[in-house]
Amino acid sequence: SSEKIMDFIIRCDPDVVQPLRNVVDDTYESSGLKNYIDTHNLGICFFSPLKHGLLTGKYTEPVTFTNGDHRSGVKEFQDTTLLKIILSNKTLLEQRFFNHPNPVLHGLVDSLLFDVPTGCVLLGQRNVQQVQAASTLGKLLTAKDAEWVKTLYSS
């Protein structure tokens, strides 16, 4: 977590840190990590920006993963209400960013980077289509668009 990184960052003196961050799980700023990164001009690489695919709207019904699959411990995959909200948000992202080839990914990923000049995200890409989709990302959102995306997932 960003909070845990802050507990050790001074002693470790890293060049780059890798916290969890997505539009649902986001303590990057509230933990003080953003301020530290900006002040010390460090690199940052966010992992789980799609929350294991959950935020893409790909899952419309609760899903059970096989034993050993890291997603089996993510309770949100079983939350019918949340899955409906995510599906609705997917539609809203598609409408707002209709001119982007991957509007959902654009909103979810690029909203994390709009004010992070030394940042990147780690996307788990398992096939050529996912690599091609990822290659369309990186066009920064405006502060207004980034805030709109985050607001979709904050309620």
Question: Positions of the model-derived regions?
Answer:
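Beta/alpha (TIM)-barrel catalytic core signal, keyed to glycine-rich beta->alpha loops juxtaposed to Asp/Glu
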Residues: 1-154
